[in-house]
From Swiss-Prot:
It comes from Canis mesomelas elongae (Eastern African black-backed jackal). Belongs to the cytochrome c oxidase subunit 2 family. This is Cytochrome c oxidase subunit 2. GO terms for molecular function: copper ion binding; cytochrome-c oxidase activity. It is a multi-pass membrane protein.
């Protein structure tokens, strides 16, 4: 969960998000080293009077500044491709949930059950209870089992939306006429908040997402009551 004045990313709750955090730190360190080198060279150019106006050819320097950026790009691309492959891989999901974006709410359907579906609307500010979060609470939470692979099928009934939950490393476009899929696995129980991340109209800011991750026994009890 995010907190006021937070500068970093949210705490990782899924293996994918942990990998994304490691990749973020890896890339940030490379950017920091490059920036430091560039600033050092600029400071030398501004403070020294030594110049080489007669230099017409520098094969060694040209070779270095051609090969070095290529190596840096490879060091960034390899872990990135690995994470992209992990995010795209879906093996034997334990549960499938179909979510549809609407202007301006989400609807969910548990496809493994015969009649388990509902709409999820934001709770208006004037109806919030003490301790609830403004613009993030919904009337129907998406209850899912923790430590199990869940496949999310994402689409839209009208315009472009985007189903995103930052702490799980999820962001999938909801496109009319197209069915996108992603997987999630939460390692800890709790409430995880997200929002529509694609500008979809006047009430775009009022399409929150709330996932309630619970142990399998609680999920089975909840699903039995809902059906």
């Amino acid at each position: 969960m995010a907190y006021p004045f937070q500068l970093g990313l949210q705490d990782a709750t899924s293996p994918i998000m942990e990998e994304l955090l490691h990749f973020h730190d890896h890339t940030l360190m490379i950017v920091f080293l490059i920036s430091s080198l560039v600033l050092y060279i600029i400071s030398l150019m501004l403070t020294t009077k030594l110049t080489h106006t007669s230099t017409m050819d520098a094969q060694e320097v040209e070779t270095v500044w051609t090969i070095l950026p290529a190596i840096i790009l490879i060091l960034i691309a390899l872990p990135s491709l690995r994470i992209l492959y992990m995010m795209d891989e879906i093996n034997n999901p334990s549960l499938t949930v179909k979510t549809m974006g609407h202007q301006w709410y989400w609807s969910y359907e548990y496809t493994d059950y015969e009649d388990l579906n509902f709409d999820s609307y934001m709770i208006p500010t004037q109806e919030l209870k003490p301790g609830e979060l403004r613009l993030l609470e919904v009337d129907n939470r998406v209850v899912l089992p923790m430590e199990m692979t869940v496949r999310m099928l994402v689409s839209s009934e009208d315009v472009l939306h985007s189903w995103a939950v930052p702490s799980l490393g999820l962001k999938t476009d909801a496109i009319p006429g197209r069915l996108n899929q992603t997987t999630l696995m939460a390692m800890r129980p709790g409430l995880y908040y997200g929002q529509c991340s694609e500008i979809c109209g006047s009430n775009h800011s009022f399409m929150p997402i709330v996932l309630e991750m619970v142990p399998l026994s609680y999920f089975e009890t909840w699903s039995a009551l809902m059906v």
